[in-house]
Protein backbone atom coordinates (compact mmCIF):
# COMPACT_ATOMS: atom_id res chain seq x y z
CA UNK A 1 0.00 0.00 0.00
CA UNK A 2 1.35 3.41 -0.95
CA UNK A 3 1.36 6.55 1.11
CA UNK A 4 -1.56 8.90 0.50
CA UNK A 5 -1.11 12.64 0.78
CA UNK A 6 -2.94 14.81 3.27
CA UNK A 7 -5.66 17.18 2.14
CA UNK A 8 -9.17 16.97 0.78
CA UNK A 9 -10.11 14.71 -2.13
CA UNK A 10 -12.62 15.53 -4.88
CA UNK A 11 -15.51 14.22 -2.78
CA UNK A 12 -14.90 16.53 0.18
CA UNK A 13 -13.40 13.76 2.31
CA UNK A 14 -10.18 14.32 4.22
CA UNK A 15 -7.42 12.04 2.99
CA UNK A 16 -5.25 10.36 5.58
CA UNK A 17 -1.95 8.62 5.33
CA UNK A 18 -2.20 4.88 4.81
CA UNK A 19 -1.08 4.21 8.38
CA UNK A 20 -3.76 6.58 9.76
CA UNK A 21 -6.52 5.02 7.67
CA UNK A 22 -5.44 1.44 8.37
CA UNK A 23 -6.08 1.72 12.09
CA UNK A 24 -8.43 4.27 13.58
CA UNK A 25 -9.47 4.14 17.21
CA UNK A 26 -12.98 5.41 17.85
CA UNK A 27 -12.72 6.52 21.47
CA UNK A 28 -16.14 6.09 23.00
CA UNK A 29 -15.78 7.24 26.57
CA UNK A 30 -16.52 10.97 26.39
CA UNK A 31 -20.11 11.12 25.21
CA UNK A 32 -20.36 13.17 22.01
CA UNK A 33 -20.03 12.38 18.31
CA UNK A 34 -17.44 14.99 17.36
CA UNK A 35 -13.94 14.58 15.95
CA UNK A 36 -11.38 14.11 18.71
CA UNK A 37 -8.61 16.65 19.11
CA UNK A 38 -6.05 14.31 17.63
CA UNK A 39 -8.35 13.40 14.70
CA UNK A 40 -8.38 9.70 15.62
CA UNK A 41 -12.09 9.29 14.95
CA UNK A 42 -15.43 9.98 16.56
CA UNK A 43 -16.59 9.72 20.14
CA UNK A 44 -19.73 7.75 20.78
CA UNK A 45 -20.51 7.70 24.49
CA UNK A 46 -22.10 4.24 24.34
CA UNK A 47 -19.36 2.35 26.17
CA UNK A 48 -16.22 3.16 28.09
CA UNK A 49 -13.91 1.12 25.88
CA UNK A 50 -12.79 1.78 22.33
CA UNK A 51 -14.17 0.23 19.17
CA UNK A 52 -11.23 -0.20 16.80
CA UNK A 53 -11.51 -0.42 13.03
CA UNK A 54 -8.67 -1.47 10.70
CA UNK A 55 -8.34 -1.92 6.96
CA UNK A 56 -8.38 -5.69 6.39
CA UNK A 57 -5.36 -7.41 4.83
CA UNK A 58 -5.35 -7.17 1.04
CA UNK A 59 -7.44 -3.98 0.82
CA UNK A 60 -6.08 -0.54 -0.04
CA UNK A 61 -6.83 2.06 2.63
CA UNK A 62 -7.76 4.56 -0.11
CA UNK A 63 -10.67 2.31 -1.17
CA UNK A 64 -12.12 1.58 2.27
CA UNK A 65 -14.53 3.93 4.07
CA UNK A 66 -13.75 4.02 7.77
CA UNK A 67 -17.08 3.83 9.69
CA UNK A 68 -18.40 7.04 11.21
CA UNK A 69 -21.18 8.11 13.50
CA UNK A 70 -23.31 10.56 11.50
CA UNK A 71 -24.73 12.70 14.31
CA UNK A 72 -24.41 13.09 18.09
CA UNK A 73 -27.52 10.93 18.64
CA UNK A 74 -26.65 8.17 16.16
CA UNK A 75 -26.82 4.64 17.56
CA UNK A 76 -24.38 3.06 15.14
CA UNK A 77 -21.33 3.44 12.94
CA UNK A 78 -22.25 3.71 9.24
CA UNK A 79 -20.84 0.96 6.99
CA UNK A 80 -20.23 1.51 3.27
CA UNK A 81 -19.94 -0.69 0.19
CA UNK A 82 -16.68 -0.97 -1.77
CA UNK A 83 -18.18 -0.90 -5.27
CA UNK A 84 -21.23 -0.08 -7.37
CA UNK A 85 -23.66 -3.00 -7.15
CA UNK A 86 -27.05 -4.10 -8.52
CA UNK A 87 -29.34 -6.23 -6.36
CA UNK A 88 -32.17 -8.48 -7.51
CA UNK A 89 -35.21 -9.07 -5.33
CA UNK A 90 -35.16 -12.52 -3.72
CA UNK A 91 -31.38 -12.93 -3.99
CA UNK A 92 -28.82 -12.97 -1.20
CA UNK A 93 -25.46 -11.20 -1.23
CA UNK A 94 -22.34 -11.01 0.91
CA UNK A 95 -20.68 -7.61 0.52
CA UNK A 96 -17.09 -7.01 1.61
CA UNK A 97 -16.36 -3.85 3.60
CA UNK A 98 -12.57 -4.07 3.61
CA UNK A 99 -12.68 -3.73 7.40
CA UNK A 100 -11.72 -5.65 10.50
CA UNK A 101 -13.01 -4.62 13.93
CA UNK A 102 -12.13 -5.14 17.57
CA UNK A 103 -15.30 -5.04 19.66
CA UNK A 104 -14.49 -4.66 23.38
CA UNK A 105 -14.90 -7.76 25.56
CA UNK A 106 -18.39 -7.94 27.05
CA UNK A 107 -19.95 -6.26 24.00
CA UNK A 108 -21.27 -7.39 20.62
CA UNK A 109 -21.42 -5.60 17.28
CA UNK A 110 -24.77 -5.90 15.48
CA UNK A 111 -24.96 -5.04 11.77
CA UNK A 112 -28.36 -3.87 10.50
CA UNK A 113 -29.55 -1.89 7.46
CA UNK A 114 -29.61 1.89 7.79
CA UNK A 115 -33.22 3.06 8.03
CA UNK A 116 -33.00 4.50 4.49
CA UNK A 117 -32.29 0.97 3.18
CA UNK A 118 -34.91 -0.98 5.17
CA UNK A 119 -37.23 -0.85 2.15
CA UNK A 120 -34.60 -2.62 0.03
CA UNK A 121 -33.10 -5.39 2.12
CA UNK A 122 -33.07 -7.22 5.41
CA UNK A 123 -29.92 -8.26 7.17
CA UNK A 124 -28.52 -8.94 10.58
CA UNK A 125 -24.94 -9.74 11.42
CA UNK A 126 -23.29 -10.46 14.74
CA UNK A 127 -19.67 -9.48 15.39
CA UNK A 128 -18.31 -11.26 18.47
CA UNK A 129 -15.67 -9.53 20.59
CA UNK A 130 -13.06 -12.17 19.71
CA UNK A 131 -13.63 -12.07 15.91
CA UNK A 132 -10.83 -10.43 13.91
CA UNK A 133 -11.77 -11.45 10.37
CA UNK A 134 -13.09 -9.47 7.42
CA UNK A 135 -16.44 -7.76 8.09
CA UNK A 136 -19.15 -8.35 5.47
CA UNK A 137 -22.66 -6.97 5.08
CA UNK A 138 -25.20 -9.71 4.38
CA UNK A 139 -28.02 -8.56 2.09
CA UNK A 140 -31.30 -10.40 1.45
CA UNK A 141 -32.88 -8.19 -1.21
CA UNK A 142 -36.63 -7.58 -0.84
CA UNK A 143 -36.63 -5.20 -3.83
CA UNK A 144 -34.55 -4.55 -6.93
CA UNK A 145 -32.14 -1.72 -6.14
CA UNK A 146 -28.61 -0.49 -6.70
CA UNK A 147 -25.92 1.20 -4.63
CA UNK A 148 -22.88 3.30 -5.49
CA UNK A 149 -19.32 2.85 -4.27
CA UNK A 150 -18.86 4.25 -0.74
CA UNK A 151 -22.63 4.47 -0.18
CA UNK A 152 -23.55 3.92 3.48
CA UNK A 153 -26.08 1.08 3.52
CA UNK A 154 -25.70 -0.55 6.94
CA UNK A 155 -24.79 0.36 10.48
CA UNK A 156 -22.84 -1.31 13.25
CA UNK A 157 -24.40 -0.93 16.70
CA UNK A 158 -22.16 -1.91 19.63
CA UNK A 159 -24.03 -2.95 22.76
CA UNK A 160 -23.34 -4.86 26.00
CA UNK A 161 -23.69 -8.64 25.75
CA UNK A 162 -24.23 -11.05 28.63
CA UNK A 163 -22.47 -14.35 28.06
CA UNK A 164 -22.66 -15.91 31.51
CA UNK A 165 -25.53 -18.23 32.23
CA UNK A 166 -26.92 -20.31 35.03
CA UNK A 167 -29.15 -23.36 34.67
CA UNK A 168 -31.95 -23.38 37.26
CA UNK A 169 -35.21 -25.31 37.70
CA UNK A 170 -38.13 -23.76 35.77
CA UNK A 171 -40.12 -23.23 38.94
CA UNK A 172 -37.46 -20.83 40.27
CA UNK A 173 -37.66 -18.42 37.31
CA UNK A 174 -39.21 -15.08 38.27
CA UNK A 175 -42.84 -14.90 37.15
CA UNK A 176 -44.01 -12.03 34.91
CA UNK A 177 -47.37 -10.57 33.95
CA UNK A 178 -46.84 -11.78 30.37
CA UNK A 179 -46.08 -15.31 31.45
CA UNK A 180 -45.79 -17.82 28.61
CA UNK A 181 -47.54 -15.67 25.98
CA UNK A 182 -45.59 -15.20 22.77
CA UNK A 183 -45.98 -14.57 19.04
CA UNK A 184 -48.16 -11.46 19.23
CA UNK A 185 -49.70 -12.11 22.64
CA UNK A 186 -48.62 -8.68 23.93
CA UNK A 187 -50.66 -6.86 21.27
CA UNK A 188 -50.48 -5.81 17.66
Swiss-Prot record:
SUPFAM superfamilies, sorted: dUTPase-like
CDD domains associated with the record: trimeric_dUTPase
Entry keyword Magnesium: yes
Annotated stretches, region: Disordered: 1-34
Keywords from the UniProt entry: Hydrolase, Magnesium, Metal-binding, Nucleotide metabolism
InterPro entries, per database record: dUTPase, dUTPase-like, dUTPase-like_sf, dUTPase_trimeric
Single GO term (MF): dUTP diphosphatase activity
One of the GO BP terms on file: dUMP biosynthetic process
Catalytic activity: dUTP + H2O = dUMP + diphosphate + H(+)
EC number(s) reported in the record: 3.6.1.23
Cofactor(s) recorded in Swiss-Prot or TrEMBL: Mg(2+)
Keyword Amino-acid biosynthesis part of the UniProt annotation: no
Protein family per UniProt: Belongs to the dUTPase family.
Function summary: This enzyme is involved in nucleotide metabolism: it produces dUMP, the immediate precursor of thymidine nucleotides and it decreases the intracellular concentration of dUTP so that uracil cannot be incorporated into DNA.
Protein name (Swiss-Prot/TrEMBL): Deoxyuridine 5'-triphosphate nucleotidohydrolase
Species for this entry: Ictalurid herpesvirus 1 (strain Auburn) (IcHV-1)
Amino acid sequence: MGEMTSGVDGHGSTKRTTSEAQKMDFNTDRGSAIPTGDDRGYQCGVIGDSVRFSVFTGYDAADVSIPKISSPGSAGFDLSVLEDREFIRGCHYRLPTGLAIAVPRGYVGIITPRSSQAKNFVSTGIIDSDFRGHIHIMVSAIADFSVKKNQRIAQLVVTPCLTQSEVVPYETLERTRRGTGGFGSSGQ
